[in-house]
Amino acid sequence: MKHKLDVTINELRLKSIRKIVKRINTWSDEVKSYSDDALKQKTIEFKERLASGVDTLDTLLPEAYAVAREASWRVLGMYPKEVQLIGAIVLHEGNIAEMQTGEGKTLTATMPLYLNALSGKGTYLITTNDYLAKRDFEEMQPLYEWLGLTASLGFVDIVDYEYQKGEKRNIYEHDIIYTTNGRLGFDYLIDNLADSAEGKFLPQLNYGIIDEVDSIILDAAQTPLVISGAPRLQSNLFHIVKEFVDTLIEDVHFKMKKTKKEIWLLNQGIEAAQSYFNVEDLYSEQAMVLVRNINLALRAQYLFESNVDYFVYNGDIVLIDRITGRMLPGTKLQAGLHQAIEAKEGMEVSTDKSVMATITFQNLFKLFESFSGMTATGKLGESEFFDLYSKIVVQVPTDKAIQRIDEPDKVFRSVDEKNIAMIHDIVELHETGRPVLLITRTAEAAEYFSKVLFQMDIPNNLLIAQNVAKEAQMIAEAGQIGSMTVATSMAGRGTDIKLGEGVEALGGLAVIIHEHMENSRVDRQLRGRSGRQGDPGSSCIYISLDDYLVKRWSDSNLAENNQLYSLDAQRLSQSNLFNRKVKQIVVKAQRISEEQGVKAREMANEFEKSISIQRDLVYEERNRVLEIDDAENQDFKALAKDVFEMFVNEEKVLTKSRVVEYIYQNLSFQFNKDVACVNFKDKQAVVTFLLEQFEKQLALNRKNMQSAYYYNIFVQKVFLKAIDSCWLEQVDYLQQLKASVNQRQNGQRNAIFEYHRVALDSFEVMTRNIKKRMVKNICQSMITFDKEGMPVIHFP
C-alpha cells in the first residue's frame, strides 16, 4: 500500500520532470522534418556546443533527447513514449527510475546514454548477465552508430577467451559500452594490476546506468569480487574438526542465533574441545588455528544449508544467491569457510587461495562520476538507496493502467497441504488453456513440481537459472495458450512475457508463487511477470507454517501446537482467525529478514571502508609509478634515507656485522668495502654510509642498462613489484582479519572499531614495507635481455 505522503512527493518530482518532457515534445515536432543527414549532423553540433562551453549536458537534454527519439523511430521503428522520456530524465539526473515490467527500459536508457556519450568520456549500460548485455547491445547498436557514436559489448562472448594485447583498451575506447557488473568489476581489478602504462585499459568511469539496480547494488552489495592468488598454507584440520563438531549439542556445547548468522561455543563446548584436542587453553595463541577451524566448522554445519545456501553439483560446492535463487558457479566463500562446507559434505577439501585484489559492487559504482539505475521495485529500497548512494527513487507512471489482479495469499497448515492445493489450482487453470507460471524459491522445489505435473500428463518447461540464454527464450514463450512453466525466482529475469493469441480473453498469464521470498521486492518482481503493458493477468502467493521464511526468521511456535493438526484441513484453511494469524507471522518474518539484510549490508559497508580507502591510496601510488617517464633524473635518495633511518631505529644495537649483513640482504651482493671507518654508535653516520652504498649500486645498475628507456622500464617494474607484493599480503590479511573479527563479535560496533584499528596499524606497516622493498628491488634486481632483445627483470 502506498503512503499518501510518498504519492505526493512522487507527484511533485514528476511535476518538474513533465516540464522538461514538454520541451522535448516541442523539439520532437521540429526534428521530425529534418532529413536523415540533418538529424545525424546534430551529434557533431552537440559535441561542438559542449566543447565550446555554449551548452552543458543539462541544457542540451531536451534537444538531444528529441534527436535520439526521432532516430529511434527511423532506425528501430520504436518511438519513445512520454513515460519513457520521464524515465530517461530521471536516469540523466543520476537517480533511480522505477519502471514496471514491459515499460521499455531498454529503449529508455538509449537517450541518457546518447546524451552523456556526447561528452566523449564514455558511458556504460550495466546489467546482471552476459545474455541481457549482449541482447540489448545488439538491439540498440544500430541506433548509436546511425547517430555517429561508437558502441561495443564490454567483453568477447566466447568461453575462456584470451584477450590479445590492446584488445580491451579498444573495447573501452567506444562511446557506449554494454556490459555486466561482474565483467566491469573484474576489469577494474585487472586494470589495477597492470605492470605498465600500456597495459592499462580502463578509462575513468564517467556515467553508468545499472539495470536491475536493486539486485546489483543492494542484494549483491555484500558479495565481493575477488581475484585469487597463490595457495595459502592449507590446514589439515577441516575433516578432523568436522568430526568433533558432530558430537556437540546445541544449548549445551554451543549457542546460535540463525537470524543473525551467529554461533559460538559455550563453556562446556570449550571444555569438550580442550579435552578432544588435548590442549590446555583453547584461546591461547598456540591454539588460534584450531579455534578458527572450529568456528568455521560450526558455521558450515549449522548456518549454511544444502539446497538453500549451496548445491553439491558435479563434485563441487556451488553457492546460491539467497535473495534471487540464482546459482553462482565459480564463486567461493572466503577465509576457509568454503573448505569447511566441503568437509561437512564429506568432499575432498579444495585449496584455499590468498586474495590478490577485491572490491564490492557498492564501492565499484561509487567510482563513477555519476550513475543511475532502473528497476521495477525501487521504491521498497528507497531508504537504502538514499543512505548508501544519495539516490532518490522516482516512480514512473505506466503507459497503460495495470490490470493484473494480485490475489490475497492462500494459507495452509503444512507444505504438503499447500502443494496439493497448488497442483489442484494449476490443473484447473491449465484446463481452461490459460498459461501458468509457477515460481519456486529453490531449484529442488521446481524440480519436484515439474516431475509431478509430468506425471499428471501436463507438459511443462523447467527453468532453474542455469542456462540464461535458453531460459530467456523459454520464459518469453510462457504467455502462449496452454503453456505451463515451472521456474525459480531468477530464471529468465529481464525477459518480457508477451501474451499469445487468445490468452487475453482467458484472463492473461497466471503467476503462482510457492512461498514469500526473503525480500518483498522479490515478491513484487515475481508478481510483475504478469500484467505487462496493461495486459490482464493474476498472481497469488501460497503460504504455510512450513515455509522457509517462517522457519528461518519467525519465533512463532504456532506450528508446534499439536491441536492445530487435529483440526480438519479444509475447515482450518477457511478460518479467518487462522489465516490472519499465519499472514501476520509471514509478514513479520519477512520484515525481520529485510531488516537483517539491511543491517548486514550496513555492516559490510562499514567493514569495506578501510580496504576501500587503502585500495584507493595504493592504486594512486601504482599510477604514479606508471607515469614515471624520466627515471634517470629522479632522486631516490629521500626514499632510501627513510628506509635506512627505519633500519637504524629498529635495531637495538648497531654492529659492524649487522650493518654488513643488511647491505648484503638489501643493497649489494658484491659488497667488499672496509667499514672500519664507520662509527656504528652514530646512527646518522650509518645512514650516511648506507646512502653512499645505495648511490653506488644505483649508478652501477644504470650503467648495466642499454638505454634510458630500459632503465625507466626497470624502475617502474621493480617499484610495482614492491607495491604489489605488499598490497597482496595486506588484502589477504584484511580478508582474514574481517572473518576473525566477525566470528568473535558479530554485529557489534566494537568489532568494527577493532577491525578499523588493526587495519590502520597494518596499513602503516605495509607502507613501511613497500619503501623497504622498493630500495631492495631497485638495488638487487637484475635485468637481462632475451633472444628478441626484450628486457627480463629478475627480482631478489
UniProtKB/Swiss-Prot annotation:
This protein's record includes keyword Cytoplasm: yes
SUPFAM superfamilies to which the protein is assigned, alphabetical: Helical scaffold and wing domains of SecA, P-loop containing nucleoside triphosphate hydrolases, Pre-protein crosslinking domain of SecA
Residues noted as binding ATP in the record, renumbered to the chain: 84, 102-106, 496
Classification via Gene3D superfamilies: Helical scaffold and wing domains of SecA, P-loop containing nucleotide triphosphate hydrolases, SecA, preprotein cross-linking domain
Family according to the record: Belongs to the SecA family.
GO BP term, pick one: protein import
An example molecular function term from Gene Ontology annotations: protein-exporting ATPase activity
InterPro entries: Helicase_ATP-bd, Helicase_C-like, P-loop_NTPase, SecA, SecA2, SecA_DEAD, SecA_motor_DEAD, SecA_preprotein_X-link_dom
SMART domains: SecA_DEAD, SecA_PP_bind
PROSITE patterns in alphabetical order: SECA_MOTOR_DEAD (PS51196)
Function: Part of the accessory SecA2/SecY2 system specifically required to export SraP, a serine-rich repeat cell wall protein encoded upstream in the same operon.
Subcellular compartments: Cell membrane; Cytoplasm
Entry's Gene Ontology cellular component terms: cell envelope Sec protein transport complex; cytoplasm; plasma membrane
Source species of the chain: Staphylococcus aureus (strain NCTC 8325 / PS 47)
Subunit structure: Monomer and homodimer (Potential). Part of the accessory SecA2/SecY2 protein translocation apparatus required to export cell wall protein SraP.
Main location: membrane
Descriptive protein name: Protein translocase subunit SecA 2
Mode of membrane association: Peripheral membrane protein
EC number: 7.4.2.8
Catalytic activity: ATP + H2O + cellular proteinSide 1 = ADP + phosphate + cellular proteinSide 2
Effect of inactivating the gene: No effect on cell growth, significantly reduces export of the cell wall protein SrpA. The small amount that is exported seems to be glycosylated normally.
Keywords tagged on the record: ATP-binding, Cell membrane, Cytoplasm, Membrane, Nucleotide-binding, Protein transport, Translocase, Translocation, Transport
Superkingdom, natural source: Bacteria
